[in-house]
From Swiss-Prot:
Gene Ontology molecular function: any one: zinc ion binding
InterPro entries: GmhA/DiaA, Phosphoheptose_Isoase, SIS_dom, SIS_dom_sf, SIS_GmhA/DiaA_subfam
Annotated substrate binding sites: 51-53, 64, 93-94, 119-121, 124, 171
Keyword Metal-binding included in the entry's annotation: yes
PANTHER family: DNAA INITIATOR-ASSOCIATING PROTEIN DIAA (PTHR30390:SF6), SEDOHEPTULOSE 7-PHOSPHATE ISOMERASE / DNAA INITIATOR-ASSOCIATING FACTOR FOR REPLICATION INITIATION (PTHR30390)
Protein's gene: gmhA
Organism: Clostridium acetobutylicum (strain ATCC 824 / DSM 792 / JCM 1419 / IAM 19013 / LMG 5710 / NBRC 13948 / NRRL B-527 / VKM B-1787 / 2291 / W)
Domain named SIS: residues: 36-195
Protein name: Phosphoheptose isomerase
Amino acid sequence: MKNFIEAQIKSSIEAKEKILKDGQYIEQIQSIVEIVIQAYKLGKKVLLCGNGGSAADSQHIAAEFVSKFRLDRKALPAIALTVNTSVLTSIGNDYSYKNIFERQVEAFGKEGDVLIGISTSGNSENITLAFKKAKEIGITTIGFLGKDGGENKNYCDFPLIVPSEDTPRVQEAHIMIGHIVCDIVEKELFGEKVDE
């Protein structure tokens, strides 16, 4: 058991080291931060969606924006499209599960907002449809993806693809990236500027 635990920890570290050592990922995270900051400066909001563990990540990241990450500051508008069971089950029943996020993007999204779709496989049809609807409205789309980015990468403006085939490692990297984004956005808007 000890060896298995150590192997899992090493695997998690390796996935994050790949991100750390490849300047492309750092630049992508910087771009995402800049997009979110610009949206907030313009009085816009962030929408987030995902399935399963990625739904939980959507809620987690939204909570960091609305409540706080580190600083006591003004709340930032962020909505996880994964939390209203009446809306989710109504859309799933009246339309289809694939439409659960698309309909909410149509209802809540406004031009200039940001949509972060999270999918470890990159092949979540409901994320693809949400991205398509967002583009119709004029919402900037960001994908936190895994594996090879799947279909989702073709429908978002900024696909960030974690370099791993292992779902748990992808999820761990997604929440790490989400935390980095929240941390820098908060500091840039309300605290000390982050050094280049």
